[in-house]
Swiss-Prot record:
It comes from Chlamydia trachomatis serovar A (strain ATCC VR-571B / DSM 19440 / HAR-13). It comes from the Bacteria. Disulfide bonds: none annotated. NCBIfam families: PRK05422.1, smpB. This is SsrA-binding protein. Required for rescue of stalled ribosomes mediated by trans-translation. Binds to transfer-messenger RNA (tmRNA), required for stable association of tmRNA with ribosomes. tmRNA and SmpB together mimic tRNA shape, replacing the anticodon stem-loop with SmpB. tmRNA is encoded by the ssrA gene; the 2 termini fold to resemble tRNA(Ala) and it encodes a 'tag peptide', a short internal open reading frame. During trans-translation Ala-aminoacylated tmRNA acts like a tRNA, entering the A-site of stalled ribosomes, displacing the stalled mRNA. GO terms for biological process: trans-translation. The gene is smpB. It is found in: Cytoplasm. InterPro entries: SmpB, SsrA-bd_prot, SsrA-bd_prot_CS. Pfam families: SmpB. Gene3D superfamilies: 2.40.280.10. GO terms for molecular function: RNA binding. GO terms for cellular component: cytosol.
Length: 151
C-alpha cells in the first residue's frame, strides 16, 4: 500500500524555501480522519511549535465531518505531532535559529495512518519569489517545446 496525499500546502512552497523535510504522525479523532478522507483539510496558515518537549501543529484547519453529530471535532485546534525525541530536539534547534521556521507541507495516508510532512523552511524575499516564477515558466516552455518536437 503506497502513500496517498490528501492535502498539500501550496502556499508554503511559494512563501518559503524548503531546506529539509520530515514525516511525522499526528494525533487525530475519528471525525477528523473521516473529514480528511473527504479532503476536508487546509494547511494554509499552519505552523509547528515545540513546547515542553512535544511538537504541536497549530492553525491547521480540518473541516467538521458533514455526517458528524454533536461529538464532532473543533475545526482549528492544537494537534500533537508524533516524533522521536531526537527529531524534536533537532526541530527545536532549527526553530531557534534566526530566519527558520517549521511548517507543514502536506497530509498523507501511509499504510492506513495519517501522517504530516513537515519542512524546515527559510522565508523567501520578493525577488526570490519572482526568480522562482521565472524559472518555473522557463521549465514549462522547455517541456512544451520538447513535447512539440516529438510530434
Amino acid at each position: 500500500m503506497g502513500v496517498k496525499e490528501i492535502v498539500s500546502n501550496r502556499k508554503a512552497f511559494h512563501h518559503y524555501e524548503v531546506l529539509e523535510t520530515l514525516d511525522a504522525g499526528i494525533v487525530l479523532t475519528g471525525t477528523e480522519i473521516k473529514s480528511l478522507r473527504d479532503h476536508g483539510g487546509n494547511l494554509g496558515d499552519a505552523y509547528v511549535t515545540i513546547s515542553k518537549g512535544e511538537a504541536w501543529l497549530l492553525q491547521s484547519s480540518i473541516a467538521p465531518y458533514r455526517f458528524g453529530n454533536i461529538n464532532n471535532h473543533e475545526e482549528r485546534r492544537k494537534r500533537k505531532l508524533l516524533l522521536h525525541k531526537y527529531e524534536i530536539h533537532k526541530l527545536d534547534a532549527r526553530i531557534s535559529q534566526k530566519g527558520l521556521t517549521v511548517v507543514p507541507l502536506s497530509f498523507f495516508f501511509s499504510k492506513g495512518f495519517v501522517k504530516v510532512r513537515i519542512g524546515c523552511c527559510r522565508g523567501k524575499k520578493a525577488h526570490d519569489k519572482r526568480q522562482s516564477i521565472i524559472e518555473r515558466e522557463k521549465n514549462r516552455e522547455l517541456a512544451a517545446a520538447m513535447k512539440r518536437s516529438y510530434r
